[in-house]
Amino acid sequence: MGQEKHVFTIDWAGRQLTVETGQLAKQANGAVLVRYGDTAVLSSATASKEPKPLDFFPLTVNYEERLYAVGKIPGGFIKREGRPSEKAILASRLIDRPIRPLFADGFRNEVQVISIVMSVDQDCSSEMAAMFGSSLALCVSDIPFEGPIAGVTVGRVDGKFIINPNVEQLEQSDINLVVAGTKDAINMVEAGADEVPEETMLEAIMYGHQEIKRLIEFQEEIVKAVGKAKIDIPLYEVDQTLADEVKALAETDLLKAIQVHEKHAREDAISAVKKAVVEKFEEEDRDEATIKQAKDVLNKLVKNEVRRLITEEKVRPDGRGVDQIRPLSSEVGLLPRTHGSGLFTRGQTQALSICTLGALGDVQILDGLGVEESKRFMHHYNFPQFSVGETGPMRGPGRREIGHGALGERALEPVIPSEKDFPYTVRLVSEVLESNGSTSQASICASTLAMMDAGVPIKAPVAGIAMGLVKSGEYYTVLTDIQGMEDALGDMDFKVAGTSKGVTALQMDIKIDGLSKDILEEALQQAKKGRMEILDSMLSTIPTSRGELSRYAPKILTMKINPDKIRDVIGPSGKQINKIIEDTGVKIDIEQDGTIFISSTEEDMNQKAKKIIEDLVREVEVGQLYLGKVKRIEKFGAFLEIFSGKDGLVHISELALDRVGKVEDVVKIGDELLVKVTEIDKQGRVNLSRKAVLREEKEKEEKQS
């Protein structure tokens, strides 16, 4: 590629897409600067010169956010970017998934693909620019890669599909779909939707693929102009003589072990066969490299037989039919002090979800490159080692946990009631207690149960199911409700979540080059059938959301005031609102339109805070009577508090019907007097009269007599 700068441009979805090569990051194997509108992303691809001694392909994909891209300085003391945001982690996964299947089997050189977001135009997706740049950086490099791939975002407004919708269009869209693929097929799908039918989702996917083809043609033109020749990297291969020897030793016993239906018994049986082969080789003083290859042959034998049984005999490892769901059970209300809890079990996969309700002030504040500043609905996913019967370090959430949590959040968000109808922050935590595949979808089902148990008035229950695929040449089998072994040894993990009305979330990962429309259609329809069965099971446990919230959940009281009076409630430097919070123990959130949310676990404290606020914003009216308390006495009169925060003066001449010599002769501090407002002067000072009230009472008595 040399040192010369090259620039390539096309129009993409009504905006200019420009690629620059040859100027930046020239020591990487491949690097491109992608400009999409005012968004700019630098993508680079680098590979190690030697293969790593690993039994997997060491690919790392990073999407790096820089706050300077949106003109921000990071908060905190350090003033530099720290750990990646949730959005950055999800974007890294989004780019990794369509790229990973396009490296050859046996590729063991470490590959690192890094996209640095340098400028952000909110209407021009930095994630799509980074995906395009990551593919192109690999393609123009000398790293062997069977791309290119590209991705687009598809929205739908008023029934019409839109490629790469802007922020305003996305807010109106009932679909937010990211689809990626090669020129010939789709290999990654990620979507959120507002209960959209399967047929429409399939249309959106295929609509996006047409635009992907254009982007791939553009990449091919660039590669033809500036691409490097691919280097010859040796692939890891097993010695065929050794493979035949291991096969002769173990194949018969492995075939029997594979057909044991129970997970742990099957794993133990397979492990025993593998152990016998390894021990034989150790007795023969075979070297470590040979023993490692023997283990790889054994794993390949297991994989091939599981796949053969599924494609040729339609027999699954646990004996189910291809469209059969594992036994289902569910339960709610397990944890008495939580606001809501739901347990969902599907075979040997089990998730317990807990719903917690909070005030609107408990929203998550987002500090990133997007336009969204906060969110009031959160779903977090935890996967402890004991769920698979293993030990391991307890760390914070990794990419997988964050990805599964976000998928559940996307699936459930369309059914969360609006802030107006339900002024609460909602947090769901899903604890995976047992795992044999499809835990993310179990967490969606358990979370639905937890919200219904908590009394959240969701629009409809949501269930999720994971579909699998085993493909051999032109023949393929779509599997419903895949378990761990089918996920590990199969070709697809296609997660579909939704209500009885339609899809709310999709996520598809594959290990082959891509999928045809026919396979996608079959998988979606088979998933719909399974989802309906799961929903029926869940609704037999709890048919509708509970009619009232847990007594341990905060009670939220809503009131409305004149927006001009907000400053009176807050007070100088927040003094007034902090005093209300201190006196009552409530939480107070104030909207700009004057809507106030008061929350507490004690309803009487909510009412007390409401009364204080009402008094603070109350308008004094001339001619009205008020019961005031004497707060201060001067020679010329008494100052009364007629309601919280509002004082008025009763002049000495207005204290009684007769002449008063000293104020103290009539009132003392703490006395309560019924007074009438006679005047509010230009400075807002309130003049009161006790004499006027006494005169009216006297006249009334005289009339009655």
Swiss-Prot record:
Named from the GO MF annotations, one term is: polyribonucleotide nucleotidyltransferase activity
**What gene codes for this chain?**
pnp
Question: What is the stated purpose of this protein?
Answer: Involved in mRNA degradation. Catalyzes the phosphorolysis of single-stranded polyribonucleotides processively in the 3'- to 5'-direction.
**Sequence positions that bind Mg(2+):** 487, 493
* A Gene Ontology cellular-component term: cytosol
Task: List the SUPFAM superfamilies.
Answer: Eukaryotic type KH-domain (KH-domain type I), Nucleic acid-binding proteins, Ribonuclease PH domain 2-like, Ribosomal protein S5 domain 2-like
- One Pfam family from the record: RNase_PH
Annotated S1 motif domain ranges read 623-691
UniProt name for this protein:
Polyribonucleotide nucleotidyltransferase
EC class, as a word, reads transferase
Q: Which cofactors does this protein require?
A: Mg(2+)
Q: Which organism is it from?
A: Bacillus pumilus (strain SAFR-032)
Q: Which family does it belong to?
A: Belongs to the polyribonucleotide nucleotidyltransferase family.
- Record's HAMAP family? PNPase (MF_01595)
The protein's location, in the record's own words, is: Cytoplasm
